């Protein structure tokens, strides 16, 4: 499956096209795509330019979007930068993004917390005055049909044998505190709940030792038979096939839940309870009513920040006893909301 920001950009283009067909086009910038001539031609035919950060191969590709934004400003176009993260990025990565922040007329963010992170940056804090908030939709829509896989059959068999299957969807990196969920798994096992925790995703290689540290913690807790890491999953049909065999999802997050967590929204589409650390600030979802409704209806269960591993275990067990009759997930209108918010800045 495509990286999260790339998938977001493609879906944003499609959503804006639905609002005003023929108004927009896309330019993909990779190591092999997007020559200087391509960039000049594409930007030259536009009235405004929208760019999404962060990018995966930033060391090798960063000059291309920066060139596009610079050309756009020289042509007196409006430049909108969609910035998904800030403090969670490596400081060198943030440094390379500073020219984009300076060139942008408007910076779209999806979380008040991320905006506060930029505001307290000692170098770029003053740029936060350019920021506006938009509601983030999920990158992946639940398909009409799911796909089978050997891992799905393994999870199905585990549930049939009475195991409690706990899910964690998305890339695995330190910001998601993957090792904390291992501690929760150990608590549930000590209580006799016979858990099987499945991480549906793969490790991000940019983070040194994250996989080795994870595996060391698995061994330390003696969870070799209780933890599965799926690795890369090719399609949404296969992803949701795995989701169908999960009893509950769990995300212990040090920063707390933010409105930029698309992986949480993807998991919430399943109708399975999603247990996650509560937000750091009460205003986190004031701009995102659909996200707030998921919390109010119990699709997303908040655990107070600072809670111990036992509190997450308690929340998982309690969620299994609650009704899962949540309102239908209107994927198209989630994207319509985002497209309208960003189009208003063009």
For every predicted segment, state its role.
Residues 196-213, 232:
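Glycosyltransferase donor-sugar binding loop
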Residues 211-233, 297-299:
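Nucleotide-activated donor-binding/catalytic signature segment of Leloir-type glycosyltransferases, i.e.
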Residues 101, 233, 240-246:
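Short alpha-helical donor nucleotide-sugar binding micro-motif in glycosyltransferases
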Residues 4, 304-314, 320-346:
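A charged, aromatic-enriched C-terminal amphipathic alpha-helix characteristic of glycosyltransferases
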Residues 155-176, 182-185, 189, 197-198:
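Conserved donor-binding/catalytic core segment of Leloir-type glycosyltransferases
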Residues 103-152:
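Donor nucleotide-sugar binding/catalytic pocket of nucleotide-sugar-dependent glycosyltransferases
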Residues 241-258:
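Acidic donor-binding loop of glycosyltransferase active sites
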């Amino acid at each position: 499956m495509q990286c999260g920001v790339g998938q977001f950009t493609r879906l944003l283009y499609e959503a804006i096209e639905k609002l005003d067909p023929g108004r927009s086009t896309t330019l993909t910038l990779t190591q092999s795509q997007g020559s200087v001539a391509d960039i000049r031609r594409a930007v030259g035919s536009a009235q405004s330019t929208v760019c999404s950060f962060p990018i995966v191969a930033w060391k090798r590709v960063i000059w291309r979007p920066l060139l596009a934004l610079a050309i756009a400003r020289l042509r007196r176009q409006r430049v909108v930068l969609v910035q998904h993260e800030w403090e969670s990025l490596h400081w060198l990565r943030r440094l390379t993004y500073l020219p984009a922040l300076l060139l942008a007329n408007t910076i779209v963010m999806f979380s008040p917390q991320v905006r506060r992170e930029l505001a307290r940056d000692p170098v770029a804090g003053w740029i936060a005055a350019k920021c506006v908030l938009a509601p983030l939709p999920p990158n992946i829509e639940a398909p009409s049909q799911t796909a089978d896989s050997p891992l799905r059959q393994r999870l199905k068999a585990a549930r049939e044998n009475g195991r409690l299957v706990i899910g964690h969807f998305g890339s695995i990196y330190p910001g998601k505190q993957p090792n904390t969920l291992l501690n929760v798994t150990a608590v549930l096992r000590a209580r006799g709940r016979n858990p099987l925790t499945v991480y549906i995703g793969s490790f991000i290689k940019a983070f040194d030792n994250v996989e080795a540290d994870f595996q060391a913690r698995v061994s330390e807790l003696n969870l070799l038979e209780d933890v599965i890491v799926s690795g890369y999953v090719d399609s949404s049909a296969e992803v949701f096939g795995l989701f169908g065999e999960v009893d509950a999802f769990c995300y212990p997050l040090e920063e707390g839940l933010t409105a930029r967590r698309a992986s949480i929204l993807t998991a919430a589409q399943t109708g399975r309870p999603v247990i996650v650390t509560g937000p750091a600030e009460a205003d986190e979802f004031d701009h995102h009513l659909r996200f707030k409704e998921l919390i109010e209806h119990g699709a997303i269960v908040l655990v107070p920040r600072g809670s111990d591993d036992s509190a997450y275990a308690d929340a998982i067990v309690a969620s299994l006893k609650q009704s899962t009759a949540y309102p239908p997930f209107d994927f198209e209108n989630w994207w319509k909301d985002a497209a309208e918010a960003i189009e208003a800045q063009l």
